[in-house]
Amino acid sequence: MTMAPIHVCFSSDEAYAQHLAVAIASILHHRAQEDELVFSVLDGGISEENRRAIAAMTAAGEASIRFLHVDSAIFENAPIQTVQGGVSHVTLATYYRLLLPSLLPGVGRIIYLDCDLVCRASLAPLFAVDMQGSWVMGVEDIDAARHTERLGLERYVCAGVLLLDLAAWRRNGVEKRCLDFIRDHRDRIVLHDQDVLNVVCQEHLSYLERTWDAQACNTRQGRVSGFNALAKTANIVHFIGGRKPWHPG
């Protein structure tokens, strides 16, 4: 029996290229023998040198990769700084995932991953999850209670690990809905594309098991919520927030 390709997507610019490489390497290291991995990178300005290095590493891991240029001008009016004064680790590349239906017209389902994570298991079980009609699946955000109250929602996922039904997105015009929301409700957006996805897809959004996005952070809510403890055994460890493991101190 031939296994379907597992489509995996990242967004990155040059600043996050090294972290992209680590994330891909972790997936390759933990792949099952039968996994056919197809990587797509939404490229916001990765250098030719780094593209070649990442492509060579991926090929050595018997997977394929493509870099797709994205015109960041599409999101020139999208907010990057939050009302709290700014999130320095976020760039416009975070919004690129909203364009996936048109950037990857032949792909029906995809796993979207942030670059600030490591994978510790095969992605095949995640890719095979029964979405039961959902357009978006993700793990409940570590601070979901605050964000659901802020936006008037029932559910709120972390956008760092997503299972997306791109075929459903195309049928329902989700890409356009997201762009329209950015244009018309800019003042409501604090957490960038994550807010946009949760609002636009709220009625067609459901939760993944926590093991697929253990949101490890150096904050009190991280310790209290149990996400940091989960990170010791999780399939994916996601280093959320502004303080990353590679930062000094």
Where are these regions (language model features)?
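Glycosyltransferase catalytic domains, chiefly GT-A lineage
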Residues: 1-249
